[in-house]
Amino acid sequence: MAKGMMASTEARTQTQQRPVTRELASFASKLRYEEVQPEVRKRVLLLTLDQIGAALVASTLDYITRVREYALEESPDGLSTVIGSQRKLRPEWAALSNATAGHGVETDDYHNIALAHPGCVPVPSVLAVAEQIDARGHETIVALALGFETIIRFGLCVMPSMIKDRGFHETCVMGVFGSAVGAGRLLGLDPETLASALGLAASHASGTTEYAESGGEVKRLHAGLAAMGGLRSLSLARRGFRGPPTILEGRRGVFQAFSDEYRVDAMVEDLGNRWDFLTTAIKPYCCCGLIHAHIDALRALMAEEGLRPDDVLEIIVGTDPLSLVHVNRIGARPADMNSAQFSSHFSLAMTLVMGGNDFAHYVAAQSAGFSDPAVVRIAEKIRLELDPEAEAAFPEHFLARVRVKRRDGSTIERTRYATGTPDAPLTEAEIRGKYRRMAGGIVGDATANAIERAIDALADDAPARDVLRPLSAGARRS
């Protein structure tokens, strides 16, 4: 799909007037639970579980705490749960805090072709509204499916140009529309009002990827800003405040504003019959998804060739063009957690020296000031280069070739697809195991299990409020 995704200027001109904003709004407003295929419903629940686990594991971090404290200070009391607090806030403020946490440690989901994170904005947005209006499970599943799909479809329209050519961050640019569509469906907005809300949401679309060049914590906040922006846009639209109903496809709409190359029709092609978010990847490692294939190839060399740090003269990572831009800049000496997670050099060195790339490994690296001599020594021996096979496969497939020159004069290499993607998917048991490790380590097994049961119960039309209710019960780590 992606090879034909990018349109010429002539083709864009011919298709840009298709009213995809209104088509999307109409579809979202009218979709019924019975029309959502069983495999779609099941995937919604697993992605929701994974996202809540990601938010819980990040909830104790300093920078997440600062955002939560800001929300608690600014918001009046409400009905929406704030992860990490016993207070409940207005939906937009709870979503700001929870979405920032959900995107807070690079363990949330991602999509190869759309190059997007579909879960971290719709899940907190939809659940915050669901708590406020006491929504049931089936309508919540529909809303989440629409939020996920909106983000992925947006990515299919504008990626990879939006990030590679313009440097915009997909989570905030696309996420605000996923928030608006998902929560707007839950609120029962008619097509005209929802289209207007999308027009307003565009004014919240923002965020660059400069964090991948020089670090900073702002990337985490992009999910929160998108969630809040989507909900605020809905509130204004419901009061009659209008936005342009051609905001996606228009001559001065968001597609042309954020991308050099885009395809308007991808937003609505076969909508309802084909759900592109089904191929969303769930991360096994706590770092940028572009690095995962690099890690998998290196892990194969460790397991199959007995590779050790002392063996290494040089590590050459053959990869795709976007990785050369997005995870190749920071190098061997990251300044903070975010930059470590966007450094292929440092993350691969952690794999070889520390034995893994879980959240706990990055916390340990942070405790050492990201300057552990053994890790830095290996990181300085790593370089990235363009690999023809990886380039040809990208973005449908995340592929990497890792070649290691050893001190004994030999060279070994492995090629791997990224674990967690459709090429090497995690099983349902592995996804649930990941959630239980993340959530159980923060709130205890009893609370984590109660949340998991409540998410599964959405399929039986249980109240959506039950999903985060265990956190409000004051359960402590067990």
What feature does the model see in each segment?
Residues 58, 126-133, 180-186, 233-237, ...:
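Well-ordered alpha-helical scaffold segments within catalytic/enzyme domains
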Residues 101-158:
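Hydrophobic alpha-helical hairpins/lids featuring a short glycine-rich hinge
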Residues 76-79, 150-159, 204-212, 324:
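Secretory-pathway/luminal and periplasmic proteins that interact with or process carbohydrate-rich
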Residues 1-115, 218-228, 235-478:
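Terminal-appendage/accessory-domain detector
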Residues 114-120, 140-144, 162-176, 219-225, ...:
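Active-site nucleophile and cofactor-binding loops and adjacent substrate-binding regions
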Residues 132-144, 188-195, 243-246:
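Structural helix-adjacent loops and short alpha-helical linkers that scaffold large soluble proteins
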Residues 87-106, 142-156, 193-204, 256-257:
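Short, charged, amphipathic alpha-helices and their helix-cap/turn boundaries
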Residues 121-124, 166-186, 196-266:
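Amphipathic alpha-helical interface segments
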